[in-house]
């Protein structure tokens, strides 16, 4: 991924996060990260979703923290390089939303 990640400023957050909040992403209390839970019809759809996200995350060299049980996938995004939320997280969350919508 080109360029060093920087932690989002208050102004950048005000500009970039409302669309993600509107679709269920939440900022984590006590940690500079965003989180969302996804529910699918079954395990195969949940795993397919994770596979599509994983391929994109690898291309971006920006990987989510996630947890899966059967049809549920919990995702947390934060950028280790800047110890907080960066535009990389916003971009990956937006991609994740597109994948989730296409799989429901």
Swiss-Prot record:
Molecular-function GO terms, alphabetical: 4-alpha-hydroxytetrahydrobiopterin dehydratase activity; identical protein binding; phenylalanine 4-monooxygenase activity
Main location class: cytoplasm
Enumerate the UniProt keywords alphabetically. Acetylation, Activator, Cytoplasm, Lyase, Nucleus, Tetrahydrobiopterin biosynthesis, Transcription, Transcription regulation
Q: Which Pfam families match?
A: Pterin_4a
- Which InterPro entries does this entry report, sorted A to Z? PCD_sf, Pterin_deHydtase
Which residues are modified to N-acetylalanine? 2
Q: Which GO terms describe its cellular component?
A: cytosol; nucleoplasm
Q: Which SUPFAM superfamilies match?
A: PCD-like (SSF55248)
Provide the binding site for substrate. 61-63, 78-81
Subcellular location per UniProt equals: Cytoplasm; Nucleus
Q: Which GO terms describe its biological process?
A: tetrahydrobiopterin biosynthetic process
* Top-level taxon: Eukaryota
* Top enzyme category: lyase
The protein's annotated catalytic reaction(s) are:
(4aS,6R)-4a-hydroxy-L-erythro-5,6,7,8-tetrahydrobiopterin = (6R)-L-erythro-6,7-dihydrobiopterin + H2O
Does ATP-binding count among this protein's keywords?
Answer: no
Name the EC number(s): 4.2.1.96
**What family is this?**
Belongs to the pterin-4-alpha-carbinolamine dehydratase family.
Subunit (UniProt): Homotetramer and homodimer. Heterotetramer with HNF1A; formed by a dimer of dimers. Interacts with HNF1B (via HNF-p1 domain); the interaction increases HNF1B transactivation activity.
Q: Name the job this protein performs.
A: Involved in tetrahydrobiopterin biosynthesis. Seems to both prevent the formation of 7-pterins and accelerate the formation of quinonoid-BH2. Coactivator for HNF1A-dependent transcription. Regulates the dimerization of homeodomain protein HNF1A and enhances its transcriptional activity. Also acts as a coactivator for HNF1B-dependent transcription.
Listed HAMAP family:
Pterin_4_alpha
- Name it: Pterin-4-alpha-carbinolamine dehydratase
Q: Which organism is it from?
A: Bos taurus
Lineage here is: Eukaryota, Metazoa, Chordata, Craniata, Vertebrata
